[in-house]
From Swiss-Prot:
Its cofactor is Fe(2+). Binds 1 Fe(2+) ion per subunit. This is tRNA N6-adenosine threonylcarbamoyltransferase. It catalyses: L-threonylcarbamoyladenylate + adenosine(37) in tRNA = N(6)-L-threonylcarbamoyladenosine(37) in tRNA + AMP + H(+). The gene is tsaD. Fe cation binds at H114, H118, D301. It comes from Streptococcus thermophilus (strain ATCC BAA-491 / LMD-9).
Amino acid sequence: MADRYILAVESSCDETSVAVLKNEKDLLSNIIASQVESHKRFGGVVPEVASRHHVEVVTLCIKDALSEAGIVAEQLDAVAVTYGPGLVGALLVGMAAAKAFAWAHGLPLIPVNHMAGHLMAAREVQELEYPLLALLVSGGHTELVYVSEPGNYKIVGETRDDAVGEAYDKVGRVMGLTYPAGREIDELAHKGKDVYDFPRAMIKEDHLEFSFSGLKSAFINLHHNAEQKGEVLVTEDLCASFQAAVLDILLAKTKKALERYPVKTLVVAGGVAANQGLRERLAEEITDVDVVIPPLRLCGDNAGMIALAAAIECDKKHFADLDLNAKPSLAFAGFEE
């Protein structure tokens, strides 16, 4: 049987990425052009700046991905692209590039949900056993997803307000940390102690929804009150206390979901899945199911994960026409026309 090659494009936020996947899960290349330095001074992603950067580098990323993979366009079997959720301008740049490439080379177009990409990045670690449960944690999303079979997703719990990654960045900004703040808070937390009493919203309630706005507000209020009184707070202890509250919430809801949905596999994915504290707590507290976490290089936004999700859609022949539009608020579901 001939090898199958998929070119994947990801541009939903502030990373321009293009990857080439051979067959089901052999990533031959995964080019990532990060914009972090451009957004640091703003303390967050500026949509217009992100879009302009995507325009500047997406064509070069495609060229580099093919070159690193050691193949030419004529060997490709399909082109995959993130069509949501994300920043509409950023999505449109990647989609325009992917659609133009697909049209020019007569290739079918595979639309991929960005969050499905995060989840399916776990396929590179091992073959996933279905049904499974996934905890997806990133800058824009915090959700528990039940996956009955490949490509069939159902949200069973999600945040009512801030995503967990968003909360990290906001408290990091208050402390004067560099954007994005997640890694630095995690490192500082390992040097501090959980001495500040932050709220764990809805942790004892039976539903599977999350809330981080109260925790974020409590943190900001404590920090501002200390500043006004001239009190000195220990940054390491602040980070340790904040992270302990976040992880208590995530673990409590995940355990409830595992009780409600008996599965053998838990996938934990998204940018926040790179958090060392989260990985440690998962290893300590969830031992009765197989916990699968993508490697660090596939936790943040990248086209490799989009290609891994696209392979499943390609198997099902879920292709889109070239009039496919960006869906910045795309709901997590199966294939959407």
